[in-house]
Amino acid sequence: MQKLITFAVPCYNSAAYMRHCIETLLSAGEQAEIILVDDGSVKDETPAICDEYAAQYPTIIKAIHQENGGHGEGVNQGIRNATGLYYKVV
């Protein structure tokens, strides 16, 4: 079944507010796909949080880790991996 919407969340050292963002997006349920794009975070727990949620919600969340390429590359990585009918960057 195709997801209705893909939410892409480009992240860079974003641990302080990631959980709130992800928990809010999870309210969309199985109709949504959430792609967490870790853009080379090194100063906090961003990569671990991405992996934690991807393991906990494997049918909804995908974690992608890449070298730092900036916000635009995070958005593009989300587009390349999106399967939803609609696409939204958060």
Where do the language-model regions lie?
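Glycine-rich, basic loop-to-helix element that forms the pyrophosphate-binding segment
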Residues: 66-82
